[in-house]
Amino acid sequence: MPRLHNGPALVIGFMFLFAQGASAQAQQSMKHGGSMQVPQSASPKDTPAKTALPIAVSPPVCPAGQPFDPVVNMCMAHGTMPMPVLTFSLNQFAVYSTTSGPRGQSRVTGPGVGMLMYNQPLSPKNTLRVKIMGTAEQLTVGDKGTPQLFQTENIDNMHPHDYLMALEFRDVIKLGAGDDQELTFLLAPRGAAATGPVPFMHRASAEGNPDAPLGHNLQDGFHDVSTVLGIAYRNSGTTVEATGFSGHAISWPFPLHKVDSYSVRVTQKIDDHVLIGASYADVLSPDDAGGAEHEKFVTGWLATTHTLDRATLKSSFIWGQVRVGHDPALNSFLAEAVYQRGMNKLYGRGEILQITPSQLDLVPPDGSTDAKWVKALTLGYERTLVEKGPFSLFFGGSFTRDFAPVEFRPDYGSAPRGAKLYFRIKVGSSSAMRDGM
């Protein structure tokens, strides 16, 4: 039940409304009579008794989109206050993975991520957004990781993420009369830096694919970093972002570190079907000798979404580059897409990237330390088994053919490959809450 804290103010407001009504009646009388007529004195019996009528005060005519609020007796310049919204989502796999060759492995793992988002309006033009993202991969994947040849951070396996991947607080301020302009301030003990496209685990063009891209460290590897401060400005389809963050390795739970790295990102929505973007990051990363070195990341991407008859096609094309100190730059190229028609999905991914022998803990026969080009092609299929409200259950499988350079074949074989079978659970729900939480 709403509480009234300003009793005197309401009384004064009522008196003000009463005075306005009386003034309006006087002006109406002057319009009809030319001037106010002072009545002659009359005896009580000559003047019939009249009952006082309530004064009706019509609300003012407000501009479009600005409703009248009778409580405060004024037009609400920015519309009514929206309700708080709580959103939960989960994307969880149970995967059997097998890879071939001298480094081949087979294992069951459970990669996945869950996210909780809360939007609390502070005013009609100001919203606080809180995002918490976490995973159980430390338990469901473990230190060994998910088998995948040519992954470099956890060699030949996709590493598990930390329990807490994001704890972000955003203050979003609408500018101007409409919704075209926004200014956002970001504070995150753990969160995403403004680098690269949407991370692979959230990317629409990677829906259903349990594999991480081999080049994800060059393309979107800073989706969970420490001590992030940021600002973003959006004007219609154009968004410009800047973040400062720590290049220090993240650890549990989420200790804060010195902000020693920065990034900038620009995205442009061409229309409802095409989006392009580019980013640059200078990261001070710890090295093996106990010091730190600057790593410079440049990324560009194109994302598309199209409806074809009763099907959808979503695709991404990504280029990422990193240069460590004065070393030669390493490049990665990715093209991926998912085609969905009814309960069926077909997805694919092709990658070409440069990998050094040291990244894979290799010693080539010729002793070369130069980066070599590695290629990978993945094709997969996913079927929706259950779809009920916010809950969906899928079953799928994928096959990957890797193409190793000659120098890497003693350790990987002449035709390295991998396969996966999996179940996937997806949950997404949203609720608006009256009167807050």
Segments (PLM) and residue ranges:
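Residues that define the transmembrane beta-barrel architecture of outer-membrane proteins
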Residues: P84, S106-G114, H161-L167, H223-T227, ...
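Transmembrane beta-strands of outer-membrane beta-barrel pores
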Residues: Q92-S100, G134-T140, L187-A193, N235-G237, ...
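Surface-exposed coil loops of outer-membrane beta-barrel proteins
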Residues: V95-G101, V141-T267
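Outer-membrane beta-barrel translocator/channel fold
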Residues: L139-T146, D156-M165, Y280-V298, A311-L334, ...
